[in-house]
């Protein structure tokens, strides 16, 4: 297993062992308790939902920024950031943020969302673009074994078959919201499969997912 640090982003490569791997021990605990975690455990629920949809221009390097077509517009590159998942630079060109009150009833499989706030930047707040982008996105349950994007089924990193599809590395542990959590990195065992790469934080007692970052490989 090799590690390379890029702007505080640790990139893992190489196959990990399926034996004596503490990350897999934690993953099995997640499987055991996943029906006790997530929204499906409740008949009815209420929550506040924050949604951020973003279009980015990827791989912004120094040669790109020095291109003469950007002369006089160098200020736009102050927004360049680095992905925590891939370690690559990107420039946000469209962002829509929204805040909702969500009311769900699992007994009748119905969800109602009430928009409380909305903010759009880029493309002059073009509503046609926003509608197109939102059509590309859906709500996902990360505990599901498979997640569908663009009519293709991707294996979830939390899937019971994930152990055969992903490498898992226990990278860190820390307090999140006063709860001790483990940080696990995942990446594909093989190329050219419908998979993700990223990391997640999981509670050390309930084994509920606190936070997850994913990018399609």
Predicted regions and their residues:
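Conserved "repeat-terminator" motif of extracellular CCP/Sushi domains
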Residues: 1-5, 9-13
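A generic alpha-helix preference that emphasizes hydrophobic side chains
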Residues: 6-8, 27, 204
């Amino acid at each position: 297993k090799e590690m390379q640090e890029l702007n505080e982003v640790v990139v893992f490569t190489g196959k990990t062992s399926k034996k004596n791997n503490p990350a897999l021990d934690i993953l099995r605990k997640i499987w055991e308790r996943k029906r006790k975690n997530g929204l499906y455990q409740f008949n009815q629920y209420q929550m506040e939902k924050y949604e951020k949809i973003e279009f980015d221009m990827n791989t912004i390097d120094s040669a790109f920024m020095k291109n003469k077509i950007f002369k006089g517009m160098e200020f736009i590159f102050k927004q360049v950031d680095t992905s925590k998942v891939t370690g690559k630079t990107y420039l946000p060109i469209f962002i829509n943020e929204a805040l909702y009150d969500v009311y769900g009833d699992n007994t009748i499989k119905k969800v109602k969302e009430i928009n409380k706030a909305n903010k759009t930047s880029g493309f002059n707040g073009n509503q046609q673009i926003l509608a197109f982008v939102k059509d590309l996105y859906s709500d996902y349950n990360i505990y599901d074994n498979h997640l569908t994007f663009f009519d293709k089924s991707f294996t979830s990193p939390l899937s019971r078959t994930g152990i055969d599809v992903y490498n898992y590395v226990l990278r860190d542990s820390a307090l999140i919201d006063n709860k001790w959590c483990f940080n696990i990195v995942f990446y594909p065992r093989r190329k050219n499969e419908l998979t993700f790469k990223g990391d997640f934080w999981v509670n050390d007692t309930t084994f509920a997912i606190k936070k997850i970052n994913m990018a399609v490989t």
